[in-house]
Structure formats: C-alpha cells, structure tokens
C-alpha cells in the first residue's frame, strides 16, 4: 500500500513546463473549472480565453465574449458546475458566463471598481470586493446583489469556510477578519502577520488554512483551532498568490521572487522550485492532477505556463 502511494506522487525533476502561447498581454487571472477540463485566463489586453486541457493549443481555445466587454480584473469558476464562471470587470460590471454561450447569461451593474471575486462552496453565493474595500455579496441563483458591506480597512482576498457559516477576509492590518455568514457579525480576528495579509486559501481536505503576507511569509493554520502550525519563510518579497494541490499535499506560492515555491504542507519544506523570468501573478493547481498553471509577468509574452505535463 505504501509503495502504491509513493508511486502516485509526482517525480518533480522529471516534470516539464510548457508555455501556452497566443494570448496577448500579461495574464491577470486564471483558474481551472470543477472537472479540470478547462482553464480560463484573462489578460491585460481584455481577452478571456478558455483552454481545452486535453489540447493545450491556442487554436483550440474559446474566447468568452469579446474585448468590447472591457478588462477582466478577476475570474472564478462555479465550484459546482464545470461550464459556469463569474468575472468582475474594470468598468464596474459583474458578469456570469456559461462556456457554451456566446453572451453573458447575466450581468450585474455594480457601483464599485471590483478587483477580486470568490464563490461560496455551495455555489449559492459570490462576493466581489472593490478598490475601496466595499464587499458586494451576490445571490448566484437569482444573480442579484443581496448586500454591500463597507470594510473600514484595506481588504484583499476573502473566502467562505467549507461549512459556509463563516467568511474570512485578509486585511492591511496583518489580520484575517472572520464574520458569521450570512449575518456578517464579526466574531474573531486572526493575528496572522506583522504587515498586510494579501492572500488566503483553504486546502481541499480542510485541514490547512494558508495565509500569505507582505512580510514574505506564508503561514499555515489549523482552521478548526485557528492555531498557526508552521511558517514558510523562504521568499524575500510579499506573497501574492497561493494554491493547494487537489490532495492537499502541496502548497504552491508566488511573489516577486523569480520562482514558484512548492512546499510540503505537513512540514513546510520546499519540495520543488520552478524558476521564472519574472514576478508571479497567479498559481493554480489542477483539481484532480498534479499539474500547476501559473502566470508570470515577462516581456513580450502572456506568461501563461503549465507545469507537470
């Protein structure tokens, strides 16, 4: 049994990186759908492409809408449906897409310049957050804004707990604020870092909560006890993006350091390091395989790459 488990683990030195070419401009956001059959990427050129994971070639991509819809700040797939995703636009619009449709299936006009979006585990709710730290909570079934909530401090990435009764928000105070959902009653602050907290991610097995900060540290927490189990301190620049592998065994992180760090979640030790030619914008593990998509800011390229093929 132990041998079969070992054999199933990736042999990192043998894994290759592939450039996905054809999309113009640096990649701003990317993500895999529920099944891992598609990878969506948005770029500074205004294009949103959906890549076929079985045929990772530009000629097999599908463009959602057209660039007349504006610049996508963030996109996120419905966690319960492989064809649906949500995107927040620089022009204060929030759009819901179905991959099979040429036009948005719903549009919501927001009063705020939203820059981040997340979806609840049940797929029933979404949240969009703005440059002005305004949170817009959306009923994804009726596709309407339920409530807006003004944060009194800088707010960056946010997410729901697996049970969907709590909502977590990273802040510029070095804390993660926790509110009850849907009452939005503030119940606890995690004193996570000495400076701004930028990113947050639960592991798929719900045994780890990762928080990335401006102090170049990634902290790993027990989400039940809210106790810090270990810190990863290898990087020199603020942590901007985090992603757990599907089996919760590995944590990928990225910053302005010119590499992707892949850590063992049980020890925090570096398992592998992927060199890059520029700062990292986003990392995203495939939902069922040890394949990592990541976006790098590099000249004359979108910087979209796949590791693990």
Swiss-Prot record:
It comes from the Eukaryota. InterPro entries: Tex1/THOC3, WD40/YVTN_repeat-like_dom_sf, WD40_repeat_dom_sf, WD40_rpt. GO terms for biological process: mRNA export from nucleus; poly(A)+ mRNA export from nucleus. GO terms for cellular component: THO complex part of transcription export complex. WD repeats lie at residues 22-61, 65-107, 109-148, 192-231, 234-273, 275-309. Belongs to the THOC3 family. PANTHER family: THO COMPLEX SUBUNIT 3, THO COMPLEX SUBUNIT 3 THO3. This is THO complex subunit Tho3. It comes from Schizosaccharomyces pombe (strain 972 / ATCC 24843). The lineage of its organism: Eukaryota, Fungi, Dikarya, Ascomycota, Taphrinomycotina.
